[in-house]
Amino acid sequence: MPRLDRVLETALYVDDLERASRFYADVLGLRPLFADPRLRAFAVGGQNVLLLFRRGASLEVTRMPGGTIPPHDGSGPLHVAFGIERDELTAWEARLSAQKVAIEGRTDWPRGGHSIYFRDPDGHLVELATRGLWEIY
């Protein structure tokens, strides 16, 4: 069987594209890769891309010079987790506090990892997790 290399893109659907973009760039420090009226793309860790789509803007086929992208969308609070270094967990907690982002939950995992949870401006659950969460991370 051919193998999959990684999850390349993760998509969240947002009501206010500018507000969400500011949160992911200014609060989480993600580097913008692409912007248009329908979506924003951010680099995550040099190998992954976070896509923010304006909710409802992708319900029709998207025609590109090289082909088409089928319709997609999402609703309700979704979840995304970002990996962080264990020794940066306290710094992340301080950064979120300074940015007035409330931490909703904390988890210590059986494998030794730690997670903190908070919401983005659209109510999506964002997790920052250290190694020791999964057998592969």
Regions found by a protein language model. Name each.
Residues 16-17, 85-89:
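Helix N-cap motif at beta-to-alpha junctions
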